[in-house]
Design a protein with these regions (language model features):
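Conserved donor-binding/catalytic core segment of Leloir-type glycosyltransferases
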Residues: 138, 167-171, 176-196, 202, ...
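Nucleotide-activated donor-binding/catalytic signature segment of Leloir-type glycosyltransferases, i.e.
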Residues: 225-258
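A short, active-site helix/loop in glycosyltransferases that binds the activated sugar's phosphate group
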Residues: 115, 120, 127-160, 167-169, ...
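Short His-centered aromatic/hydrophobic patch
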Residues: 76-81, 103
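N-terminal strand-loop element at the rim of the active site
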Residues: 7-54, 144, 219-225
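N-terminal subdomain of nucleotide-sugar transferases
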Residues: 1-24, 69, 164, 203-210
Length: 354
């Protein structure tokens, strides 16, 4: 979402970003429209004390940048990023427009899980102070917004907003020809045996004996996930462990017929998730296959989209019909782009400042 924001608004406003260095091998995102400060490499294998010290230094570095540049507005993503914004808003720049966005929805109970101490501490700063002084607090869809406002009744409708994570207009494919000799499926994103149906889906692929090809692009996965897939020895499954750069996804999707979602949806966050991959598949003209446990997609009016959106009951072994039927999809009615979302966001801020 940050990349789409920069690409959409970089020519209209001065943007500065403070973030950690990523731990994967993909080239870091860059954009001349924004100054991006990357400090301290993300490393989940280090001790909790090391992570805490690194977090404090990162927060102080970010606070220094805020004091130095005196922004008109501050936007942070997720509770884990709240601390430097809290310090700046409370003690330095009290007039700054504070904006908060949640790409993920977390219940109050989830902040108490093992390994969430930093997020829980930051969330206490949000509930005790930041929510009371924020100009904007957003979730990605109406369902999550309603859940969030039920958790945080101190937030008003005027402050709590919706900021979907749609892909940019440059990804748009007005027409999509499905004419592959076999059905080609693609999955992009994180994987685990615990939280996704990737193994069950791969087992089904293996049984199709070449009717379906499945390519996986993921750099964020558990070793046992890769081991389980490789153990199938299926020639129609290819696992690309290097993942794919975000900017290269549109051209990659041109090769495929179907984008697959595989979440088991064990949490409210995933049950009511319009995952960004859903719209990235649709904007490219791909059909979408998803598990029935994804409640929001199950309840959605899918007829407004031209590609076929098909529900799977994976636990019962019910998968889509893979009979090949070449066709052309007229995707011209698709109208959900990041540019419109962030333009509305900026108009809101301008009104607040005016």
């Amino acid at each position: 979402p940050v990349m789409n924001l920069i690409d959409s608004l970089g020519e209209k406003v001065e943007i500065r970003v403070s973030t950690l260095q990523k731990s994967n091998s993909l080239d870091a995102y860059g954009n001349k429209k924004a100054k991006i400060y990357r400090r301290f490499k993300e490393n989940k294998k280090r001790s909790s004390l090391f992570v805490l010290v690194q977090y404090i230094f990162f927060s102080l570095f970010t606070l220094y940048q805020l004091i130095r540049y005196k922004p008109d507005a501050v936007l942070y993503y997720e509770s884990i990023s709240a601390f430097p914004a809290y310090l700046y808003k409370r003690f330095v720049g009290r007039k700054v427009k504070l904006c908060i966005h949640y790409h993920e929805y977390m219940t109050p109970a989830e902040y108490c899980r093992t390994g969430m101490r930093l997020s829980k501490l930051n969330h206490s700063l949000e509930t005790s102070y930041l929510y009371h002084v924020a100009t904007w607090v957003s979730q990605t869809n109406q369902y999550r917004k309603e859940l969030f406002m039920n958790d945080e009744p101190q937030l008003s409708e005027g402050v709590c907003r919706i900021l979907p994570n749609y892909p940019p207009a440059s990804w748009f494919r007005k027409r999509k020809l499905h004419a592959n000799e076999i059905v080609k499926c693609v999955y992009v994103g994180s994987l685990s045996l615990t939280d996704t149906y990737v193994l069950e889906f791969c087992q089904w692929i293996a049984k199709q004996q070449g009717k379906v090809q499945f390519d996986i692009y993921s750099f964020n996965f558990h070793k046992n996930t890769l081991d389980a897939i490789e153990k199938l020895r299926c020639p129609y499954i290819e696992f690309h462990k290097e993942g794919v750069k975000y900017s290269e996804i549109p051209d990659l999707f041109d090769r495929y017929d179907v984008g697959v979602l595989l979440y088991k949806a064990k949490t409210m966050n995933v049950k009511y998730c319009e995952t960004n991959k859903f719209y990235e598949y649709l904007i490219s003209g791909l059909d979408v296959w998803y598990p029935k446990e994804m409640t929001l997609l199950h309840e959605m009016d899918k007829s407004v989209f031209a590609p076929q959106i098909v529900e799977m009951d994976i636990t019962q072994g019910l998968f889509p019909n893979v009979e090949l039927s070449p066709r052309e999809v007229d995707n011209s009615s698709y109208d959900r782009f990041s540019e419109g979302v962030y333009e509305s966001f900026m108009q809101f801020l301008d009104m607040q400042q005016g």
